[in-house]
Amino acid sequence: MRMADHFEETTMGTFLADYYLWTKSLHVISVLAWMAGLFYLPRLFVYHAEVVKAGTETDALFQTMERRLLRAIMNPAMIATWIFGLLLVFTPGIVDWSMLWPWTKAACVLAMTGFHMWLAARRRDFAAGANRHKGRTYRMMNELPTLLMLVIVFSAVAKWNYWGF
């Protein structure tokens, strides 16, 4: 008996299958919250880098907004996205790892998580008064989550099995 077959027969496999639509809904909600933060934080960095002088009252305001966005919205949303996503992966019959789509989605989710970590490091730079990037860098980096999102959505919805779609 394959391990996957055994998992499908377990109580956990049955539980995940029974609550699949709830898990999927919570996954989509957390992804939306995470993506909102991934789109907004680089925008804050653009204005922080281009307009705000370090050590000013406005600098402190931007640092507060950036910290709260990251800690209160983005971090919990990323964690929830991962938890609900992994629950979906372990739901029997949902992911066929012999196809291409779960691998492209997984690679892009890892890249999105890496981008999140990069943003967290840049927030620490601003907090230390040590930002070394121009607004243009943050403007360009702001496009990365959009590109990753496109690949993730097409992977998860179209479930392609080869690069010719």
Swiss-Prot record:
Required cofactors, per record?
Answer: heme b
Q: Which InterPro entries match?
A: HemJ-like (IPR005265)
Co-factor binding details: Binds 1 heme b (iron(II)-protoporphyrin IX) group per subunit.
Q: Name one GO cellular component term.
A: plasma membrane
In which pathway is this protein known to take part? Answer: Porphyrin-containing compound metabolism; protoporphyrin-IX biosynthesis; protoporphyrin-IX from protoporphyrinogen-IX: step 1/1
The protein's Enzyme Commission number: 1.3.99.-
Membrane-protein topology: Multi-pass membrane protein
Q: Which UniProt keywords apply?
A: Cell membrane, Heme, Iron, Membrane, Metal-binding, Oxidoreductase, Transmembrane, Transmembrane helix
Q: Which residues take part in binding heme?
A: 27, 105
A biological process (GO) of this protein is: protoporphyrinogen IX biosynthetic process
The answer to whether keyword Repressor applies is no
Q: Where in the cell is it found?
A: Cell membrane
Task: Give the transmembrane region(s).
Answer: 26-46, 77-97, 99-119, 145-165
Provide a Gene Ontology MF annotation, just one. Answer: metal ion binding
* Chief localisation class: membrane
User: Matching Pfam families, A to Z?
Assistant: UPF0093
For this protein, what reaction is catalysed? protoporphyrinogen IX + 3 A = protoporphyrin IX + 3 AH2
The UniProt function text for this chain reads: Catalyzes the oxidation of protoporphyrinogen IX to protoporphyrin IX. Is involved in the biosynthesis of tetrapyrrole molecules like heme and chlorophyll. Does not use oxygen or artificial electron acceptors such as menadione or benzoquinone.
| Quaternary organization | Homodimer.
Family affiliation: Belongs to the HemJ family.
Q: What is this protein called?
A: Protoporphyrinogen IX oxidase
The organism is: Cereibacter sphaeroides (strain ATCC 17023 / DSM 158 / JCM 6121 / CCUG 31486 / LMG 2827 / NBRC 12203 / NCIMB 8253 / ATH 2.4.1.)
